[in-house]
Swiss-Prot record:
Shows highest activity at 0.5 M KCl. Does not require divalent ions for activity. Keywords: Lyase. GO terms for molecular function: lyase activity. This is Mesaconyl-CoA hydratase. Disulfide bonds: none annotated. Belongs to the enoyl-CoA hydratase/isomerase family. It catalyses: (2R,3S)-beta-methylmalyl-CoA = 2-methylfumaryl-CoA + H2O. Involved in the methylaspartate cycle. Catalyzes the reversible hydration of mesaconyl-CoA (2-methylfumaryl-CoA) to yield beta-methylmalyl-CoA ((2R,3S)-beta-methylmalyl-CoA). Also shows activity with mesaconyl-C4-CoA (3-methylfumaryl-CoA), (S)-citramalyl-CoA and (S)-malyl-CoA. Homodimer. InterPro entries: HotDog_dom_sf, MC_hydratase, MC_hydratase_acr, MCH/BMMD.
């Protein structure tokens, strides 16, 4: 009888022998299929990532987020922070990255995120504790090999229990067994919204008063406050693979080119939060941001792959002079990221406090 624990029992340098072994070996799977999730399930995510200035600065530098409040202690104190915080985009990406292994590592489509709220600033050295609750599961009539799952996720300070950020996200998740389907559409067909006005206005500056004045003028002239941002950022290996891995995001679509070769994208794709952060960086470069507040109706419309360039477009929806601290007012924006083919790849609504004129 052969002792298969003997290191010399198999010649693994023989390609034919190794191929035969691979064909016969079981694969230890990672992640969960759609059938694993049931409404009401609560999942505690194990990875204990600790926020760091290095991670935050790496994220900001790569995505063009240059707000000095997240780089310098003096500016942070001027903005009312007790100490220099990590960037909220980095915080959100870390919290979501931790959840991927349990929720969406099997792949599928990131359909969107809603009700994103930052409850308080997060600082370097904070250990994260992340939990998710399944709030809805349903079949997909258009894609029987997938189901649709929605989770509510909270990221907390592991030591104090205080909630830092929360959100709701929805993904298509592969099914272990395809569902029976009539092949019908998922919902009603989009009949299109109202046409945009002929006139598009841009604010004259980056302060709250500039946005409010532009919006007031637009309402009087039946126009819209909407504009493009000049900067673009081309997706490279660091953005597509490096940043997701640094947040413990194990989704294969961001770093396994072999796995993705036969996928609809044909290559590894960018983490949605990287694309989002670049688009928001373009917008923030044209405003005097004081503090981020919340995000809603975030959608990811198309793949972003290596070599694609991400640009930004912004529409101003509302200005509230009474919301926020004395030195800032609240502005609600709609942001759209688009690629070099002018194809939208991300959209979302954002409310931020914007500094007033001093």
């Amino acid at each position: 009888m052969t002792d298969w624990t003997d290191p010399d029992a198999l010649d693994l340098s023989d390609g034919e022998t190794f191929d035969s072994l691979l064909d016969r070996a079981d694969t230890r799977e990672k992640g969960h299929f759609f059938e694993f999730f049931a409404e009401g399930d609560e999942l505690a995510h194990d990875p204990g990532l600790r926020l760091s200035h290095h991670g935050s600065e790496q994220w900001m530098g790569q995505t063009l987020n240059h707000d000095p409040a997240y780089w310098r202690a003096d500016t942070a104190q001027e903005r009312g922070f007790e100490e220099r915080p990590v960037h909220p985009d980095y915080l959100l990406a870390c919290v979501m990255g931790i959840t991927v292994e349990d929720l969406s590592e099997k792949g599928g489509y990131f359909l969107g995120r809603d009700d994103v709220e930052f409850h308080q600033p997060a600082t370097a050295g904070t250990p994260l504790s992340v939990t998710s609750t399944v709030v809805d599961t349903r079949t997909s009539s258009s894609r029987p090999k997938y189901g649709i799952v929605t989770w509510e996720t909270e990221g907390r300070d592991r030591e104090t229990g205080e909630t830092l950020v929360s959100y709701r996200r929805t993904n298509m998740i592969p099914r272990r067994e395809p569902a029976a389907t009539d092949g019908g559409a998922v919902g009603e067909q989009d009949e299109g919204g109202p046409a945009m006005p002929d006139t598009l206005l841009s604010p004259d500056g980056e302060r709250f008063g500039d946005f409010q004045a532009a919006l007031d003028t637009a309402r009087e002239e039946n126009a819209a406050v909407a504009y493009r941002h000049e900067r673009g950022r081309t997706m490279d290996d660091q953005l597509v693979a490096g940043l997701p891995l640094s947040t413990l995001n194990t989704a294969r679509q961001h770093h396994n080119r072999d796995e993705m070769a036969d996928s609809p994208s044909g290559d590894i794709v960018a983490y949605g939060d990287v694309t989002r952060s670049i688009a928001l960086a373009h917008a923030r470069s044209d405003e005097a941001t004081y503090r981020e507040q919340r995000f809603a109706d975030e959608r990811f419309h198309d793949f972003v792959t290596l070599g694609d360039t991400v640009y930004g477009f912004t529409r101003v929806l509302d200005c509230d002079p009474d919301a926020g601290p004395e030195r800032a007012g609240a502005v609600t924006f709609e942001h759209v990221a688009f690629n070099q083919e002018q194809t939208p790849v991300y959209s979302g609504r954002r409310t931020a406090h914007i500094q007033r004129h001093q």
